[in-house]
Amino acid sequence: MHNSPAVSSAKSFDLTSTAFLIVAFLTGIAGALQTPTLSIFLTDEVHARPAMVGFFFTGSAVIGILVSQFLAGRSDKRGDRKSLIVFCCLLGVLACTLFAWNRNYFVLLFVGVFLSSFGSTANPQMFALAREHADKTGREAVMFSSFLRAQVSLAWVIGPPLAYALAMGFSFTVMYLSAAVAFIVCGVMVWLFLPSMRKELPLATGTIEAPRRNRRDTLLLFVICTLMWGSNSLYIINMPLFIINELHLPEKLAGVMMGTAAGLEIPTMLIAGYFAKRLGKRFLMRVAAVGGVCFYAGMLMAHSPVILLGLQLLNAIFIGILGGIGMLYFQDLMPGQAGSATTLYTNTSRVGWIIAGSVAGIVAEIWNYHAVFWFAMVMIIATLFCLLRIKDV
């Protein structure tokens, strides 16, 4: 046998691909262990008032946008995302440690959130590195990215129930230290197994920006994804309160609905990735938006647990395609700027949270929880109009 080099290369590539999948899951689980219980942590442990809890989420989103955009531009210019991801994981460990033992609201907001923003940036930087690796090795980027996104969805199927079990069964300290362990393992995996692809500095200096011909479409896609994520954030904020206070259904139904949707998102992402080249990203995003319109129309009319659970298939189509294709759409509109493109996509979710937090509170205060879904519907209809004007790539 004289084919050992080829076999070795294949094994090396498989090991790298497997490492990417594990890192995607770990970055997802680190976030899924913290986010679902944050409002309870702030209320019960930090003793923050409801308005301060809302301000904490808004402040987190704003700081996260500033940090992630700074790191994205720096990584696209100077390269070697591997070292940056390890650095972000280290700061993520420090953030989790601070949340585990500190109960001062302002320390957590300004120091904890700042450190957490670096930790959460490990995820988009990992996706950017994966895209560059796929392009360099000739791997199908769409399917590879879809598998990685599916790992994050899997983390969100497992993470929230585990977070509640750790926080309520043991303590928030145990929960945050578990998230710190996830960051540690993630950093070690990145350092040992992910490729290091340094960029050569260009001779000409200047700022990296989207190609002129794509700037309009990039801005339009930012608006589209922000509206879609914003409507989803409205749903996440409003749905549990709507289920409990207006439909008077069991509290656990909200958790079952979220878990069902997250589980259904995984095959949706993989199917969307498989058909992306054949059908086009714009067409798939339109399918997602139509699914969103049907989903929110159903939420406006549904009253029984069976129908609410059945609607999660439409929710999975909506979020599964957005989560799997939206990021790739940005990357294709911004060639050579994988970090900026991926972070720009990630920040559409953060801006969506800022919008949703304000809208949900005001609408529910003036009218009721049911009315919030009308605003989500309006946002999705606006998305459909925007999708008629964007070009395919």
Curated annotation (Swiss-Prot):
Organism: Escherichia coli (strain K12)
Cysteines engaged in disulfide bonds, as pairs: none
Family indicated by similarity: Belongs to the major facilitator superfamily. Set transporter family.
Membrane-spanning residues: 13-33, 51-71, 82-102, 106-126, 152-172, 174-194, 219-239, 253-273, 283-303, 306-326, 344-364, 366-386
Keyword tags: Cell inner membrane, Cell membrane, Membrane, Sugar transport, Transmembrane, Transmembrane helix, Transport
Function: Involved in the efflux of sugars. The physiological role may be the detoxification of non-metabolizable sugar analogs. Can transport lactose and glucose.
Protein name: Sugar efflux transporter B
GO CC annotation terms, alphabetical: membrane; plasma membrane
Taxon lineage: Bacteria, Pseudomonadati, Pseudomonadota, Gammaproteobacteria, Enterobacterales
One of the GO biological process terms: lactose transport
PANTHER family linked: SUGAR EFFLUX TRANSPORTER A-RELATED
Annotated compartments: Cell inner membrane
Record's bilayer topology term: Multi-pass membrane protein
PROSITE patterns: MFS
Gene Ontology molecular-function annotations: carbohydrate:proton symporter activity
Pfam families for the chain: MFS_1
InterPro entries listed in its UniProt record: MFS, MFS_dom, MFS_trans_sf, Sugar_efflux
